[in-house]
Amino acid sequence: DQGLTYVSSFIYQGISRGGNKPYYKKTDIYVPFNSWCCEAQWQKYDAETLNLNGMVVDGFNHQGYGLNRYCYSGKGTWSTCEYLPMGIAEDRETGETYIFQVESSGQWLIEYGSAQGGNLYLTVSGATEQEHGWYKNLKPGECFTTVPAGAAVVKGGLNPAVAALT
């Protein structure tokens, strides 16, 4: 038997990699807050505000990355109870916009994080053990399929990104 506690549907390493500035000085992250009576309330945050910044000094700490993460997720059986299962990141310097969505009516997780090499990553998944108490035991010969996800990277901002995803 093999126990599963986390299986990603999509990973993108290197959001806002291009250009001259580090990602934490030029990346805006749009978070899609949602509720039954107040749907699709997108809020824009810069990466530093979400604590996805790099250390500014070299030495004991690691200059250029902080190993922090910022997550939001669906909870329970209502997949959009606090957030929509999607997100947008925009590189203000290069004009690249990254858009993605989880295509699931169940639990899901979206995670941004800083990693070695001065990169910002994104992972998209279904339910996880850490956030949702999810566990799947696979017996020999059994298969597991992750939740579907869609993603696009475009030049030109939010409108072209939304058009590419739809």
Task: Locate the predicted segments by residue.
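N-terminal accessory beta-strand-rich subdomains and adjacent acidic, glycine-rich linkers
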Residues: 1-165
